[in-house]
């Protein structure tokens, strides 16, 4: 006998449904993900309960989910042979937005059983995602172990109420039929549904099946009859999660094929790590380092992050909460049993659990790179060529791992004589001179400019190695990486060289004597250059060049000024310190000039030469050329 009743939803469902349908989900095709997830959840519940009551299987222990579409009627049906629901269960679980039978089910579990129970759907809104595409939803369900005439019919148009009736249903489980809106009829297509299943539910452990039509008898090419085939249910998903299998059972080829599947990359990955974490947070991660950088890696709007699965069900792409920006090249996934999600299952809750998992995964990736650098330097150079500049963002972004990231950086160096960035900070430290306490470096516009900078002259003479940096990000990097393993990084273009014990007593005495002898010359140049410079000094870093400019301690460097200007940032006026080399013939002859006008011209010429060498350009190149021509003409005979 029919027992139809009309119920109002237990919360302000009309408003909540409207909010969810229009705001909660970012793409409507995930309604199928949610419903398949619920169906797989029901199958897992039955599997668990049947451990102690095998009769619940009712002679059918092959658990599965079946999906079918009817183009003419504009419907999609998702059917499972899982645990099903009673009338009270339907009213309770389908009548309340924030209710989830799964969450209650977890409360009844204890011990190791709860660890193994493959349950998903912590939030009750998943079912209501059906209304994103459906104008009406019909649910037919019978709880396992109940009589056929105790089945339930639930119907709603998502407008704030629903009807419940008693029906007869021979098979246990739940059948959900979506009556699609006119503008959503694209989903009543088998191929469309198959593509969604492959995308979102490929690795659910329960088989997801679709009906494959049979073929009539036909004539073959050689005249023989090709027999007819009957229609059958065909499994659409792989029904196995590769990352949940033992590493020993997975071949390199399988890992590489899976990488291509999740990344859409055509080339093999450089390396990977497959790991299960147990403890306060339990999750599995499968992480890949690609061999090639994506073309849009530097696009700030490009999404990055890991694929997120909960119990092998795909939740989202680009879960950036688990991966810092400087590791945005990493591909892979994370699968958790108890990961906290917000109510939409789209955006992760930013809490201590998420942060702890992010910390663990970050350390895992850094460990992968450290091992690669140690075991295969050539392969690491391949990685560095593709992703090194991104990794250089790390010290500014990740203070906790700054030292580890610094150990992974690679630079060109005066030691190798090559432009290839192959030198690590540990390599540099291993070659430091006795008494050397600093790591010397220079940042310039190009490798050639850095390698040929006059600032290196004294250091080269003493055999002191200098790191050569010429990437745009290097100045930013060095502002956040001031020391490594208690060794300060020191710019050879800023302030004093601070050679310390590398300078012997005789050299110090000679330098002091030269400075005393040049006091008058320094004062004359100061007067000639006026406000063009912050100061004039006798250099301690030049041997073959007449003069150079340096930034004062605490002042903005030339490269940082360029970086800010390129970003459209206001830059304060910075006057350089002008260092002269009295031992150079040009400076020596300058000191002999009695004509103050000529002295000023030559002083300006040397200053602008030094600025051109340091900056690669001048604020007023025409004035420089005019002065140069004037000086050439005056000295031509």
Curated annotation (Swiss-Prot):
It holds the Pfam family HSP90. GO terms for molecular function: ATP binding; ATP hydrolysis activity; ATP-dependent protein folding chaperone; unfolded protein binding. Residues 346-562 are annotated as: B. Residues 563-637 are annotated as: C. It is found in: Cytoplasm. GO terms for cellular component: cytoplasm. Its main location: cytoplasm. It comes from the Bacteria. Signal peptide: none annotated. InterPro entries: HATPase_C_sf (IPR036890), Heat_shock_protein_90_CS (IPR019805), HSP90_C (IPR037196), Hsp90_fam (IPR001404), Hsp90_N (IPR020575), Ribosomal_Su5_D2-typ_SF (IPR020568). Residues 1-345 are annotated as: A. Keywords: ATP-binding, Chaperone, Cytoplasm, Nucleotide-binding, Stress response. Belongs to the heat shock protein 90 family. Molecular chaperone. Has ATPase activity. Homodimer. This is Chaperone protein HtpG.
């Amino acid at each position: 006998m029919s027992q139809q009743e009309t119920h109002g939803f237990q919360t302000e469902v009309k408003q909540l449904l409207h909010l969810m349908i229009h705001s909660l989900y970012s793409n409507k095709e995930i309604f199928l993900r949610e419903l398949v997830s619920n169906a797989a959840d029901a199958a897992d519940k039955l599997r668990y309960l049947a451990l102690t009551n095998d009769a619940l299987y009712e002679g059918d222990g092959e658990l599965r989910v079946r999906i079918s579409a009817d183009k003419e009627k504009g419907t999609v049906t998702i059917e499972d042979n899982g645990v099903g629901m009673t009338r009270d269960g339907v009213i309770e679980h389908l009548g309340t937005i924030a209710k989830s039978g799964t969450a209650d089910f977890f409360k009844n579990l204890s011990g190791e059983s709860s660890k193994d129970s493959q349950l998903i759907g912590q939030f009750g809104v998943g079912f209501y995602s059906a209304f994103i595409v459906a104008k009406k939803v019909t649910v037919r369900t019978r709880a396992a172990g109940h009589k056929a005439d105790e089945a339930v019919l639930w119907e709603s148009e998502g407008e704030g109420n629903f009807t419940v009736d008693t029906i007869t249903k021979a098979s246990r489980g739940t059948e959900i039929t979506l009556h699609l809106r006119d503008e959503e009829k694209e989903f009543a297509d088998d191929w469309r549904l198959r593509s969604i299943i492959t995308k979102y539910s490929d690795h659910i452990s329960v088989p997801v099946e679709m009906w494959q039509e049979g073929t009539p008898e036909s004539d073959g090419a050689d005249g023989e009859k090709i027999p007819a085939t009957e229609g059958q249910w065909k499994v659409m998903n792989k029904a196995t999660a590769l990352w949940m299998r033992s590493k020993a059972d997975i071949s390199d080829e399988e890992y590489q094929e899976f990488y291509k599947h999740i990344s859409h990359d055509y080339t093999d990955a450089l390396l990977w790590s497959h790991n299960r974490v147990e403890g306060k947070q339990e999750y599995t991660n499968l992480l890949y380092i690609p061999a090639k950088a994506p073309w849009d890696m530097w696009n700030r709007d490009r999404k990055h992050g890991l694929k997120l699965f909960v119990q092998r069900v795909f939740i989202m792409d680009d879960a950036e909460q688990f991966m810092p920006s400087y590791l945005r090249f990493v591909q892979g996934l994370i699968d958790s049993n108890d990961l906290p999600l917000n109510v939409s299952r789209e955006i992760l809750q930013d809490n201590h659990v998420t942060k702890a998992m992010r910390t663990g995964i970050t350390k895992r990736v850094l460990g992968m790179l450290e091992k690669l650098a140690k075991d295969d330097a050539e392969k690491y150079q391949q990685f560095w060529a593709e992703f090194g500049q991104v990794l250089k963002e790390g010290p500014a972004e990740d203070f906790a791992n700054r030292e580890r990231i610094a150990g992974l950086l690679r630079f060109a160096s005066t030691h190798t004589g090559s432009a290839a960035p192959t030198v690590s900070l540990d390599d540099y430290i291993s070659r430091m001179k006795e008494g050397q306490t600093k790591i010397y470096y220079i940042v310039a516009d190009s490798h050639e400019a850095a390698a040929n900078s006059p600032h290196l002259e004294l250091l080269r003479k003493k055999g002191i190695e200098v790191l050569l940096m010429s990437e745009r990000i290097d100045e930013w990097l060095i502002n956040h990486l001031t020391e490594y393993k208690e060794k300060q990084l020191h710019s050879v273009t800023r302030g004093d060289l601070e050679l310390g014990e590398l300078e012997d007593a005789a050299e110090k005495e000679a330098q002091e004597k030269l400075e005393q002898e040049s006091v008058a010359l320094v004062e004359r140049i100061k007067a000639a250059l006026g406000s063009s410079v912050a100061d004039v000094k006798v250099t301690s870093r030049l041997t073959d060049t007449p003069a150079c400019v340096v930034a004062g301690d605490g002042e903005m460097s030339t490269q940082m000024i360029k970086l800010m200007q390129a970003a459209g940032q206001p830059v304060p006026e910075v006057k350089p310190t002008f260092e002269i080399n009295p031992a150079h013939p040009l400076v020596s002859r300058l000191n002999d000039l009695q004509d103050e006008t000529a002295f000023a011209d030559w002083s300006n010429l040397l200053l602008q030469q030094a600025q051109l060498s340091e900056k690669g350009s001048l604020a007023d190149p025409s004035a420089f050329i005019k002065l140069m021509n004037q000086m050439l003409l005056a000295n031509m005979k």
